[in-house]
Amino acid sequence: MKWKEQAVILGVRQYGETSVILEIITRERGRYMGVVKGGRSRRMAALLQPGNFVEAEWSARLEEHLGLFRLEALDFHAARLICLPEALYALQLIAFHLRLLPERDPHPVLYDILHLFMQNFDEPFVNAELLVRFEMRLLEELGFGLDLSCCAATGRKQKLYYVSPKSGRAVCEEAGEPWKKKLLILPQFLVQRATRPADFRDIINGFNLTSFFLMRYVWEPRDIKQPSVRTNLIQLFERRFGIQAFIC
């Protein structure tokens, strides 16, 4: 068995005295692990860093085997990520989320968002918005997608300003006004065609929205606490944006 595909490195751990087990994410094959022989050498250290973009060739006698990786560097993102705490935290959070999905299960949309993030990780507003979109898509991939197509109460598709915490459906401004204290705010960049970057408050509202449903449907059922890296990341965004988020 053999395949070759572009990938982003997610993590690495020791395997024996000289090798490592590498974890990558590819578009067509999902999250994959394999052995890199000699991966603990100084020569390989710079390559095997989370965030680096590589061409990975995997081979094994049988498909179910762990297999071996051979790598070719395409872009050394990791060296620049170290200088950007928001981007570094975001990549760690994305890796945490991807590990909630089955290994070798392709999720091309999540990969595409990650790849776009890697191209814009030095733009904090852009990568904050992309991270919210990633978490929204993660909920959908796990079977808990929100319905933002129309108002749950009226069927209207315009002026969708809220999300019902009970149903996960959008609610328009008029129908939601009497109950707005019990509803979640819907970031407009999730329902309107983007004509400008999301503003600070929309981004924080996006994190509040995904926090609520990730806690309800993903973290609590799996007995997982909200990852500390996510809390740290949002606190960095709060300081940058000057707006406080509600953390579930």
Curated annotation (Swiss-Prot):
Keywords: DNA damage, DNA recombination, DNA repair. It holds the Pfam family RecO_C. The keyword Cell inner membrane does not apply. GO terms for biological process: DNA recombination; double-strand break repair. GO terms for cellular component: bacterial nucleoid. Transmembrane segments: none annotated. Belongs to the RecO family. Involved in DNA repair and RecF pathway recombination. HAMAP family: RecO. This is DNA repair protein RecO. The lineage of its organism: Bacteria, Pseudomonadati, Pseudomonadota, Alphaproteobacteria, Hyphomicrobiales.
